Amino acid sequence: MKQSHFFAHLSRLKLINRWPLMRNVRTENVSEHSLQVAMVAHALAAIKNRKFGGNVNAERIALLAMYHDASEVLTGDLPTPVKYFNSQIAQEYKAIEKIAQQKLVNMVPEELRDIFAPLIDEHAYSDEEKSLVKQADALCAYLKCLEELAAGNNEFLLAKTRLEATLEARRSQEMDYFMEVFVPSFHLSLDEISQDSPL
């Protein structure tokens, strides 16, 4: 049986820090970010289905979100201001991401490739799936800003403002629900969020 380096590569996502140009009170790596995006994307899909008549596969959405930044293990996490400096750079970076995604897919043993390719290659996502993952990705970046600001790090003030504009552009009923029900707790301390649920 031929060896595959696929999961050895993915395990290195924990070595890639996000927000590399920003001073962070607590660093965040791509692996933990991907887990949070998967949880939030799953919640958005579940909310969409349960509250707003949606019909999406919440478990698939969670898997797509889990792998949404997998190519960064080969490309690194390019800071957003650089990635979107102009349309030419954004277009070239998309092409690089596509190559990295394909390289990852090619690492998977052939008998399993049809399972992993649709998770890694974002071109296999439906528009609705892509929208939910992007909403979750932006929400998690926004939550990171809230956490940094709550810790007194004003470095994230402009990022928060930019992300509020992004969230407004991607706004949906399920996002509004999530923002109203879950986000306010991110402004609270551990003691405050633990008061109602003692062990």
Swiss-Prot record:
Substrate binds at R18, W19, H33, D69, D77, L78, P79, T80, D137. The record marks R18 as: Appears to be important in orienting the phosphate for catalysis. Its cofactor is a divalent metal cation. The keyword Nucleotide-binding applies. It is found in: Cytoplasm. It comes from the Bacteria. GO terms for molecular function: 5'-deoxynucleotidase activity; metal ion binding; nucleotide binding. A divalent metal cation binds at H33, H68, D69, D137. GO terms for cellular component: cytoplasm. PROSITE patterns: HD. Keywords: Cytoplasm, Hydrolase, Metal-binding, Nucleotide-binding. The keyword Iron does not apply. Residues 30-142 form the HD domain. Its EC number is 3.1.3.89. It catalyses: a 2'-deoxyribonucleoside 5'-phosphate + H2O = a 2'-deoxyribonucleoside + phosphate. NCBIfam families: PRK03826.1. Belongs to the 5DNU family. Catalyzes the strictly specific dephosphorylation of 2'-deoxyribonucleoside 5'-monophosphates. Homodimer. This is 5'-deoxynucleotidase YfbR. It comes from Shigella sonnei (strain Ss046). The gene is yfbR.
